[in-house]
């Protein structure tokens, strides 16, 4: 099929070449022979009047023109796939759809687990692939390489739709034998003490780190770990402190002795956990179904949070108010 002189099959070839960066792998990914893919490159070069790719050993290196074309080509193919090719009535009970989701271990434990349990009942063949945090989640959304981002709203792109899940706040946690933590935690105390901190990606700050930077503050991180769930192990028997979402602190306090203390305000206001999806997925029936489940299960999490302050007072570690 041609559109204004361009064979649209060539866009599929261009997308494969940009993704694989190797001729043989790109040809294999779209079921072409290597000679056919070489011919496609020649035709692409002729149409766009650009070399598009140069060879560096066996790797294809895109030119600036190819780099500029790639996002629009990927988005166009994604729209065609979702709006025309895969547009079928969605039957959860019969679907074998797989959803790729980026989220923290906190949201996995406190939110997604309940989602997965429900989906197992309603759509037993639907599966999930949980991905680690990326420093470029916007790029993954744009390419359609991920179905959902679940993360604090402050870190979300403004170019893709989103929906609020629930609000959360931070508390300070420590070993009950911590000798350095004062009864009333000031911001000076907080930044001067040794911290165990979660890191997500090489460049993206955690929420608490972002909030501190907003006030021109910096804490002393003694142990950095790739997620919240490892934090309690590095508090035990030490005078370190850590900053955790309240729900997660309550979850840990059921099994691990923890001292839970309120953080100094207004440095650490409540924040919003939200879900975001690629704009082309907005009308995809499977995505719509999954988003509805997210929102329904999030409303149940929110309901439970109404009693969190009362529950916190009964936790293994007592909350202390500054």
UniProtKB/Swiss-Prot annotation:
Keywords: Activator, DNA-binding, Nodulation, Plasmid, Repressor, Transcription, Transcription regulation
Record's keyword annotation contains DNA-binding: yes
GO molecular function: DNA binding; DNA-binding transcription factor activity
Source taxon at top rank: Bacteria
Family matches, as InterPro entries: LysR-type_TF, LysR_subst-bd, NodD_PBP2, Tscrpt_reg_HTH_LysR, WH-like_DNA-bd_sf, WH_DNA-bd_sf
Entries under CDD domains matching the protein: PBP2_NodD
Disulfide bonding pattern of the chain: none
Alphabetical list of SUPFAM superfamilies matching this protein: Periplasmic binding protein-like II, Winged helix' DNA-binding domain
DNA-binding region per UniProt: 23-42
Residues in HTH lysR-type domain copies: 6-63
One Pfam assignment: LysR_substrate
Function: Regulates the expression of the nod abcFE genes which encode other nodulation proteins. NodD is also a negative regulator of its own expression. Binds flavonoids as inducers.
Family of the protein in this entry: Belongs to the LysR transcriptional regulatory family.
Protein name: Nodulation protein D 1
Species the sequence originates in: Sinorhizobium fredii (strain NBRC 101917 / NGR234)
Gene designation: nodD1
């Amino acid at each position: 099929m041609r559109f204004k002189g361009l064979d649209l099959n060539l866009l599929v070839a261009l997308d494969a070449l940009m993704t694989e960066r190797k001729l043989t792998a790109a040809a294999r990914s779209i079921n072409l022979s290597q000679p056919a893919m070489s011919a496609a490159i020649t035709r692409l070069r002729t149409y766009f009047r650009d070399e598009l790719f140069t060879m560096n050993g066996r790797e294809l290196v895109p030119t600036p023109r190819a780099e500029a074309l790639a996002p629009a080509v990927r988005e166009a193919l994604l729209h065609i796939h979702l709006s025309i090719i895969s547009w079928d009535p969605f039957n959860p009970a019969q679907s074998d759809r797989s959803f790729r989701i980026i989220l923290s271990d906190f949201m996995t434990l406190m939110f997604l687990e309940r989602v997965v349990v429900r989906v197992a009942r309603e759509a037993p063949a639907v599966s999930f692939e949980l991905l680690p945090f990326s420093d470029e989640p916007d790029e993954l959304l744009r390419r359609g390489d991920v179905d959902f981002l679940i993360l604090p709203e402050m870190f979300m792109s403004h170019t893709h739709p989103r929906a609020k899940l629930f609000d959360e706040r931070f508390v300070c946690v420590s070993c009950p034998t911590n000798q350095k933590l004062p009864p009333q935690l000031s911001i000076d105390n907080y930044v001067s003490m040794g911290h165990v901190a979660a890191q997500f990606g090489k460049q993206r700050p955690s929420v608490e780190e972002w909030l501190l930077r907003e006030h021109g503050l910096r804490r002393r991180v003694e142990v950095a770990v790739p997620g919240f769930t490892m934090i309690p192990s590095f508090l035990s028997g030490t005078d370190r402190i850590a900053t955790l979402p309240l729900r997660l602190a309550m979850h840990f306090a059921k099994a691990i002795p923890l001292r839970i203390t309120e953080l100094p305000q207004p440095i650490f206001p409540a924040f919003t956990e939200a879900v975001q999806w690629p704009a082309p997925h907005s009308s995809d029936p499977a995505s719509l179904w999954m988003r509805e489940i997210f929102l329904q299960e999030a409303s149940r999490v929110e309901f439970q949070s109404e009693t969190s302050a009362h529950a916190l007072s009964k936790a293994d570690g007592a909350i202390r108010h500054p």
